Amino acid sequence: MFVGLHDSDNTNFPNLALMKISAWHKAQGDIVEWWNPMLNYDRVYSSKVFTFTPECVYLPPDTIKGGTGYGLYNELPDEIDAMPPDYSLYPACKHAIGFLTRGCIRHCPWCVVPRKEGTIRPYRTWQEIKRPDSRDIVFMDNNVLACPHGLEQIQAMIGRDVRVDFNQGLDARLITSDVAKLLARLKWIRFIRMSCDTDAILPVVLDAIRMFAVEGVKPYRVFVYLLVQNVDRAEQRALALRDAGADRKSQ
């Protein structure tokens, strides 16, 4: 079988679903490559994460589509989801990516995760995600601290030769002094990330920054995502975080 893969968003961030699809087809002996509109394929897959990404009008009508960008909440079949990712699709990616948990306990109106994945649940261990050729792991969990399994995996990585990044941000409401102590013992690729999406959560985020500081994590090692719905209110949050010494990004 001749298989074409289409990364609709083309953000240079590896698409985990496409990497697993590639790995599964290659394990069946199929030929897999990036989709070329000039060629004919037996099967074409297209993944789209973001709703603002334009749809490609040249994809064949029988393309198998997936992702929230298409308004679809479909999941990979179990036999494909179980595959280790095919990192050869993204040769510039030198780290592992994956999830320790799926789902979330929150129901933020701007987030599709609870509708798509349901409540929080265990998914993988860190050993299953780690690449043999890299010590760096980028976790994409939506709320890893809300799951006992997630906390157990964090504990298990302490003292190991791995560096981590929870790139979706940690839930500041779940960061206690004990959790801050646990997180501070990890080796981080660069930042500890959190989100500050509303005015109400700002004091909680500032408390978490202070707890990290007590454990030896300098504020500049904390990165905070800012959801901008009202520019003036978001600016006030950004200024407060700046004064606390944290890095930040509006989105």
Question: Where are the predicted features?
Answer:
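Catalytic cores of alpha/beta
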Residues: 228-245
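Canonical Radical SAM [4Fe-4S] cluster-binding loop centered on the CxxxCxxC motif
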Residues: 17, 92-128
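Ser/Thr/Gly-rich flexible loops in soluble cytosolic domains mediating phosphotransfer, phosphorylation
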Residues: 64-89
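A short, structured N-terminal alpha-helical element that caps or precedes a catalytic domain
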Residues: 1-65, 71-72
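Core AdoMet radical
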Residues: 10, 45-48, 112-208, 219-229, ...
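Short, charged, surface-exposed secondary-structure boundary motifs
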Residues: 42-44, 56, 72-79, 109, ...
